[in-house]
Amino acid sequence: MVKVLSVHSFRGGTGKSNLSANLAVCLAMEGQRVAVFDTDLASPGVHVLFGFSAGDKDLLINDFLQNGKPIKSCVHDVTPSAVKAAKGRIWLAPASMESDKIAKILREGYEVERLNDAIFDLVEDLKLDYVVIDTHPGINEETLLSTAISDALVMVMRPDSQDYLGTAVAIEVAERLDVPQINLVVNKLPDCFEPDSVKQRVNDSFNYTPTAILPLSADLLNLASGGLAVLECPDHTWTQSVKDLASLLHAQVSNTQ
């Protein structure tokens, strides 16, 4: 049975999309069939990490939501060669970067229930093992409904006072939605921060121990979202931490019905 992972943050700039893409790769490197949905329609970006650039005839998730195009026509195979060699597959449902389409979706909205139904239709067509949803930051109806169908939630935050305040709200909402597994990930931890102190503060603030603490890395900054870190920097500490996170998530959702 397919498992749905939502990757969320209360604020933008946490590295949520980067983590979504790299988690998808880690799962696919284990031979899983994974689809990534970019539902951050106001500020899409996960497609950049996969090197996807929409052509004039390429259909995007906006075309499904507002123009009635079939969802299967709006997903694209973005499987890297290393993932193919590992017998995995990755599909991407990218969102439009065109300003008029972004403005239209913000102005008119969309039926989230319809998107949720389409995700599960696609599961059958592509025989998916995992769906990774890259959400829009903050708390809104669209995010709530996509989170509600998740088997596990990855809440991404930085060690920043505003993130602590906002993340508390987001976790409370997720708990009310009865998300089976809630995981806190601290990302972009500067070298000057002591990981154990951050872990303790997170635990004191939310009563959750961080599932992962990921470093702020100059190597990843140099990559500048121009590739997938787990493939470009396979021996990096950040990569190993994300692989460990993917393994933990796989174990969590494998135990859910």
Predicted regions: what is each one?
Residues 33-34, 42-92:
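Phosphate-binding loop that captures ATP/GTP phosphates
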Residues 72-73, 81, 86-137:
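Cytosolic-facing regulatory segments adjacent to core modules
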